[in-house]
Amino acid sequence: MYQELLTIKGDSYCLAKEDITCISDNWALPTSYLEFVQELGFGRLLELFLTYIPMGKDNNYCDSLERRNAYWKDVFQQYIQVPLSMLKKKENLELLMNAEPFMFSENGEVVFWDVRYPKAGEYPIYLVHFPVGIYFVGYHFREFITRLTCEETYKSILKFHESPLLPTFEPLSVNQMTSLS
């Protein structure tokens, strides 16, 4: 499914296990993201975003979805304490307070789900670029990819990019560590 949408650069995949479908007791991972990480796994998406895979509770992988989600939730809490102008809007503050981060860009943007509004096994996807703003990207992971690679839609999300992102995926190896240092 996703291999038809993306050009794959490499062939050594680190895939998510099919039996791990959540990283929290409160919400399940969206179907479209599970399909992606079970098909393509951990790597660099669109030459910019690092995709993380669920590896199970108490795993020793710093690049697991569980560990990265916890790390970015802590970072978000620190930003909430800072008087950023982008957080003066009540909607943005509430989005950040309820965010479930799942991807990070090499430019510093963080992609997250708003799990308060599930629909058909999916959650709205947002991209936050501190201190610039929070941008709605789509309702499922395939839409996330297509909106950022489309000439007509990428600029409404990636304000400082001059062209749409390339539809690529580069598989990467997951590092086993006990900290995020």
Regions found by a protein language model. Give the residues of each.
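Acidic surface patches and DE-rich sequence motifs
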Residues: 105, 118, 129-130
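Compact, glycine/acidic-enriched structural inserts
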Residues: 124-156
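Short, surface-exposed beta-strand/loop micro-motifs that present aromatic residues
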Residues: 109-117
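Short, charged/polar low-complexity linear motifs in solvent-exposed/disordered segments
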Residues: 48, 54-55, 62, 130, ...
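Generic structural signal for residues positioned in beta-strands
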Residues: 101, 111-112, 124-126
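Acidic, proline/glycine-rich low-complexity IDRs
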Residues: 146-181
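A surface-exposed partner-binding patch
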Residues: 1-109, 176-181
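A short alpha->loop->secondary-structure connector
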Residues: 120-122
